Curated annotation (Swiss-Prot):
One of its GO terms (molecular function) is arginine-tRNA ligase activity. The keyword Protein biosynthesis applies. It comes from Haemophilus ducreyi (strain 35000HP / ATCC 700724). This is Glycine--tRNA ligase beta subunit. SMART domains: DALR_1. The gene is glyS. It is found in: Cytoplasm. SUPFAM superfamilies: HD-domain/PDEase-like.
Length: 688
């Protein structure tokens, strides 16, 4: 099979940095899908992305589709010819459609008779004839939320397109894509190297970009260079660079030839909480902060330039000049905020609406204060500290710093509380009330902080559900899904003895007459229990295990988790499948029972296998009772797994629905007791 390397590059104006990698990988995936759909073989696909280009290189691409054998069946021989042996009109029409005569058709014999058939070999199309449409289709399927038009063109793309290059080996593929005539011209760096130049062969890419255009097209290589050089620059200062992967990839998407440099700022700014300085450095300027070995912020930062002059001093001074006003603002806001105690911000919360039907932020604060105290009492936290933290929880939203740097909410509350002399647990709780902020985020460290974090999230869930504004589809403006998962994670991972029904009932009572949904408690609890499914599926736990536990609707998250772990473990037993099937059978039998079911009567057992199961069930009922009380569900199901043999023997030798009512009633009692033992943990009849 003859192959050539294929290159497609789309040269654009600066692409959105946060979307660049996603666009590049989607482009490569779409190209791969197009090739596979066309039946074109290839060895490997590589993708490239810089601020001003998306490119895909396909290695060892077949230069033509493979030939295909086709077989088109026609009419049955019996109906293809008339009594004189002449082809019928139906046979002639079929043959004409195949481009042959009836006489040229083959015949095939099947179990349903003999049929006319046309067999032929269809040559595959040359790859070069397919590529333009494939690339256009791949581009049209890119995840572009807001495409744009430019100049007088009618086509749309994420940014204006200037060049399109398609090379199959050394052959330029002719055509037009996105309103641009395909050419073998690519553009270099905006300031370094040649502005544009010709590429003669797909194999020259991406090296020709580096050699002539001063562009490193490989995204992963640029990322590695930035990471390596940033770590080295920080180490030279005796520090460690704070390099989060999201910011690293964003910076990688901003430069075509990275040059990692270090700049500094005045040490006086270190009197401002580090989080505020870091917020503006990372969020606004895309800089990497540097910390010493003890975790203290150093008066230096790392930035990445897209140019590489012999003397970088002007670039360094320029970045220092840019960041200085932002740090000065943070310093001013901090000093201004310190002139007023955090608690003195409470009256201002009355001027900010949380939600029209649910009141102001002050109303929410009062509810959080009360609910924090309720939760603290239940989990053994300091009630007064929890209530104090709840009272102060939203005060920092009124400060100058948080108004300007919104992502510092919580952490600035912590710093201001410390300055005011609040208890350390109270101060820390103000920061940790928002934890977990995202999937996999850390949880609050203290029970006081857990109390406030839970109260805040439950108040939001109860309030929004209470006015009928629960999430619909992808719309979740109050982030209720995240709040619900946060509640579950805190309770489960901290092993807190809390019941969702009790918490939501307490929360509901704090809203007075504001709530209109009378089913709010059930709605919120069901919503939170439903979030367990997504959480456990991410952990790889089978859906039927989750459903088996959900069927029992345990409303204590820590208890729910213990049941899920137990059922998941139970599924590994050899006896699990048989016992699940037996429980399905028991459920069906009991559903059809037409008499009252009482307690097991051993003296009424007439069959040996019947008595054996009855005795086993009664014995296990006593054995598992203390295990259930301790929520040791794994031990419960391990014990119940021993019932497989007596259960199998029972169904093999005993007629449950005996004609004698007393026998039938007792046998139903045995099965009812058996079922109830398993239902103490979960409905294992739902296991597949």
């Amino acid at each position: 099979m003859t192959t050539e390397n294929f290159l497609v590059e789309i040269g654009t104006e600066e692409l959105p940095p946060k979307a660049l990698k996603k666009l590049a990988t989607a482009f490569a995936d779409n190209i791969q899908a197009e090739l596979e759909q066309a039946g074109l073989a290839f060895e490997k696909i590589e993708w490239f992305a810089t601020p001003r280009r998306l490119a895909v290189k396909v290695l060892s691409l077949a230069i033509a589709q493979p030939s295909k054998e086709i077989e088109k069946r026609g009419p049955a021989v019996g109906s293809a010819f008339d009594a004189d042996g002449q082809p019928t009109k139906a046979a002639e029409g079929w043959a004409r459609g195949c481009g042959i005569s009836v006489e040229q058709a083959d015949r095939v014999v099947t179990d349903k008779g003999e049929w006319l058939v046309h067999r032929a070999v269809v040559e595959g199309k040359p790859t070069k004839d397919l590529l333009v449409d494939m690339v256009a289709s791949a581009l049209a399927k890119l995840p572009i939320a807001k495409p744009m038009r430019w100049a007088d063109k009618t086509v749309q793309f994420i940014r204006p397109v200037h060049t399109v290059t398609l090379l199959l080996g050394n052959e330029l593929i002719e055509g037009e894509i996105l309103g641009i005539t395909i050419a073998n011209v690519v553009r270099g760096h905006r300031f370094l190297g040649e502005s544009q130049f010709q590429i003669a062969h797909a194999d020259e890419y991406p090296q020709i970009l580096r050699d002539k255009g001063a562009v490193i097209a490989d995204f992963a290589e640029r990322k590695a260079i930035i990471l390596r050089d940033a770590q080295a620059k920080a180490a030279a200062l005796g520090g460690v660079a704070d390099i989060e992967d999201d910011l690293l990839e964003e910076v990688t998407s901003l430069v075509e030839y990275p040059n990692v440099l270090v700049a500094k700022f005045e040490e006086r700014f270190l009197a401002v909480p580090a989080e505020a300085l870091v917020y503006t450095m990372k969020g606004d300027q895309k800089y990497f902060p540097i910390y010493d070995k003890e975790g203290n912020l150093l008066p230096h930062f790392i930035f990445v330039s897209n140019i590489n002059p012999q003397d970088p001093s002007a670039i360094i001074e320029g970045n220092e000049k840019v960041v200085r006003p932002r740090l000065s603002d943070a310093e001013f806001f901090f000093k201004t905020d310190l002139k007023q105690r955090l608690v003195d911000q409470l009256p201002r919360l009355e001027t900010v609406l949380f939600q029209q039907q649910l009141g102001t932020l002050r109303d929410k604060t009062d509810r959080i204060e009360q609910l924090s105290g309720v939760i603290a009492e239940q989990i053994g936290a300091d009630v007064q500290k929890a209530k104090r933290a709840g009272l102060l929880s939203k005060c920092d939203l009124m400060t100058n710093m948080v108004f300007e740097f919104t992502d510092t909410q919580g952490v600035m509350g912590m710093h201001y509380a410390r300055h005011d002399g609040e208890a350390e647990e109270v101060a820390v709780a103000l920061n940790e009330q928002y934890m977990p902020r995202f999937a996999g985020d850390a949880l609050p460290t203290s029970l006081v902080a857990c109390s406030v974090a839970l109260a805040d999230k439950i108040d939001t869930l109860t309030g929004i559900f209470g006015i009928g504004q629960h999430p619909k589809g992808d719309k979740d403006p109050f982030a209720l899904r995240r709040a619900a998962l946060g509640v579950l994670r805190i309770i489960v991972e901290k092993k807190l003895p809390l019941d969702l029904v009790h918490l939501v009932e307490k929360s509901t009572g704090l809203f007075g007459d504001k709530l209109t949904n009378k089913a709010v408690v059930a709605d919120v609890v069901d919503f939170m229990l439903g979030r367990f499914r997504a959480w456990y599926q991410d952990e790889g736990i089978a859906v039927d295990v989750i459903q088996a536990v959900l069927a029992r609707r345990p409303t204590k998250p820590a208890d729910f988790d213990a049941r899920v772990r137990a059922v998941s473990h139970f599924r590994t037993f050899e006896s699990a499948e048989a016992l699940a099937a037996a429980n399905k059978r028991v459920t069906n039998i009991l559903a059809k029972a037409d008499i009252a079911i009482g307690e097991i009567n051993l003296s009424a057992c007439v069959e040996p296998t019947e008595r054996a199961l009855a005795e086993a069930v009664l014995a296990l009922k006593d054995e598992v009772r203390p295990l259930i009380a301790k929520a040791n569900y794994t031990a419960v199901l391990t014990q119940l797994a021993n019932l497989r043999t007596p259960v199998d023997n029972f169904f093999d030798h005993v007629m449950v629905n005996a004609e004698d009512p007393s026998l039938r009633q007792n046998r139903l009692a045995i099965l009812s007791t058996l079922q109830s033992l398993f239902l103490e943990v979960a409905d294992i009849s739902l296991l597949q």
